[in-house]
């Protein structure tokens, strides 16, 4: 590899601020901030808005937008008209 053109790969402390969870991961992310981790060492620090600790897809708290099909919704809406009094 050519020297001097690759970013430094080092441990970086990522903080998911919405879930208040820290991840210590090897990364090339650039930052001027530092933070002391629970192991007593100081690492470069990057804040995150969303991570696997807080995203609804990973936490299982996603909303069900469509719980039934279109036909079931139609039948539910017009159930009073079907099977009513015969002529």
UniProtKB/Swiss-Prot annotation:
GO biological process: translation
Record bears the keyword Magnesium: no
Gene Ontology MF term list: structural constituent of ribosome
Superkingdom in the source lineage: Bacteria
Assembly, per entry: Part of the 50S ribosomal subunit.
GO CC annotation terms, alphabetical: ribonucleoprotein complex; ribosome
Protein name: Large ribosomal subunit protein bL31B
Record-linked HAMAP family: Ribosomal_bL31_2
GN (gene name): rpmE2
Family of the protein in this entry: Belongs to the bacterial ribosomal protein bL31 family. Type B subfamily.
Keywords for the protein's UniProt record, in alphabetical order: Ribonucleoprotein, Ribosomal protein
